[in-house]
C-alpha cells in the first residue's frame, strides 16, 4: 500500500487525487504574498484541489552575485506567517542550512530541501529533527534510485513523513530534461512523489548571469507527469512572470493557471481510476 502523508485535512499520496504546491518563486513583500495567496486559495477551492502555498525567503543559489535573493529569513517568515493566518493554508519553504530549520519549522508545515543540497547529511538531519514533513527535491545530478540513500538518511534521523520531488536532470550544459520514469522509480520507494513542472523547464545559467527557461513546455510536462500517477504538482506562479525577480522565464502566468489545472484534473482522474 502506498504511503500517505497527512497534513491537517490534506492527504498526500501517489494513488490519491493530486495536490497543488504553488506560489511565486520568492517572497517579494507582504502585499504581493497576500495577493498571490488569495488568488491561489480561491482558485484551488473552486476546483477542489488541495493546496499548499510555497514561496522562498532566500534564493541562496542565484547564478550571479547581482541576483535578487529575497527578504531573508526573519522578514520572510513573518510574511509567511501572515499568509498562513489570513488564509488558513499550509506553507512550504526552503531551508539552506541547519541553523534555519528550527526557526523555519515554527512557521511552516513542510521544510523543503533544495535540489543542490539533497545529499547534505547535516541539513537532512536538522530538518528531520524538527518533526515536520520533509520535502526533498531530487538533485539534477542524481539518478532517481539514488534517492533511496536520501530516504535512508532521513529515516535514520527520525523523519516519518517524507516527500520527494522530481525537477529535471542535467542534459548537457544549461539544459534539463524530464525523465518520467523517475516518478515511477521514486514512487517504488513508498514515498509520495511531486513533479516540479516549472523548474523542470529551467535552462540553468542559460542567460549568462541568470537562469533561463521555456515556460511554453510547462503544461506539456505537467500533463505527462500526471499520467504517470503522482501525489502532487509543484508550480511557481506569478501575475507578471516576465518582471519577477527570479525564475521569471519558468513561472506560469497566474491568469493561465486555471485552464492548466482543469486539464490536469482530468488526466489525474483517468490515471487513477480503478
From Swiss-Prot:
Compartment(s) of residence: Cytoplasm
Primary localization: cytoplasm
InterPro entries reported in the protein's UniProt record: Aldolase_TIM (IPR013785), DAHP1/KDSA (IPR006218), KDO8P_synthase (IPR006269)
Keywords carried by this UniProt record: Cytoplasm, Lipopolysaccharide biosynthesis, Transferase
Enzyme class: transferase
GO annotation (BP), single: keto-3-deoxy-D-manno-octulosonic acid biosynthetic process
Catalytic activity: D-arabinose 5-phosphate + phosphoenolpyruvate + H2O = 3-deoxy-alpha-D-manno-2-octulosonate-8-phosphate + phosphate
Domain of life where this protein originates: Bacteria
Pathway(s) the chain acts in: Carbohydrate biosynthesis; 3-deoxy-D-manno-octulosonate biosynthesis; 3-deoxy-D-manno-octulosonate from D-ribulose 5-phosphate: step 2/3; Bacterial outer membrane biogenesis; lipopolysaccharide biosynthesis
Gene3D superfamilies for this protein: Aldolase class I
EC id: 2.5.1.55
Molecular function (Gene Ontology), one example: 3-deoxy-8-phosphooctulonate synthase activity
A cellular component term, taken from the record's GO annotations: cytoplasm
Family (UniProt): Belongs to the KdsA family.
Protein name: 2-dehydro-3-deoxyphosphooctonate aldolase
Species assigned in the record: Rickettsia canadensis (strain McKiel)
Amino acid at each position: 500500500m502506498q504511503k500517505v502523508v497527512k497534513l491537517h485535512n490534506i492527504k498526500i499520496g501517489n494513488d490519491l487525487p493530486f495536490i497543488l504546491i504553488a506560489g511565486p518563486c520568492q517572497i517579494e513583500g507582504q502585499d504581493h504574498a497576500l495577493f498571490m495567496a488569495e488568488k491561489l486559495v480561491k482558485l484551488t477551492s473552486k476546483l477542489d484541489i488541495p493546496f499548499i502555498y510555497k514561496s522562498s525567503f532566500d534564493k541562496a543559489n542565484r547564478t550571479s552575485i547581482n541576483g535578487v535573493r529575497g527578504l531573508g529569513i526573519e522578514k520572510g517568515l513573518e510574511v509567511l506567517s501572515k499568509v498562513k493566518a489570513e488564509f488558513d493554508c499550509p506553507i512550504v519553504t526552503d531551508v539552506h542550512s541547519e541553523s534555519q530549520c528550527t526557526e523555519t519549522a515554527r512557521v511552516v508545515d513542510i521544510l523543503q530541501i533544495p535540489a543542490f543540497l539533497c545529499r547534505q547529511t547535516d541539513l537532512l538531519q536538522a530538518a528531520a529533527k524538527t518533526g515536520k514533513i520533509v520535502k526533498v527535491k531530487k538533485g539534477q545530478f542524481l539518478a532517481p534510485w539514488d534517492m533511496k540513500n536520501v530516504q535512508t538518511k532521513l529515516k535514520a534521523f527520525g523523519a516519518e513523513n517524507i516527500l520527494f520531488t522530481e525537477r529535471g536532470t542535467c542534459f548537457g550544459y544549461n539544459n534539463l530534461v524530464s525523465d518520467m520514469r523517475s516518478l515511477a522509480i521514486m514512487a517504488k520507494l513508498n514515498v509520495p512523489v511531486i513533479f516540479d513542472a516549472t523548474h523542470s523547464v529551467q535552462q540553468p545559467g542559460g542567460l549568462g548571469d541568470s537562469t533561463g527557461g521555456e515556460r511554453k513546455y510547462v503544461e506539456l510536462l505537467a500533463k505527462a507527469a500526471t499520467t504517470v500517477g503522482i501525489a502532487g504538482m509543484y508550480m511557481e506562479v506569478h501575475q507578471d512572470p516576465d518582471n519577477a525577480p527570479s525564475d521569471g522565464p519558468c513561472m506560469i502566468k497566474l491568469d493561465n493557471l486555471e485552464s492548466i489545472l482543469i486539464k490536469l484534473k482530468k488526466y489525474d482522474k483517468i490515471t487513477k481510476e480503478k
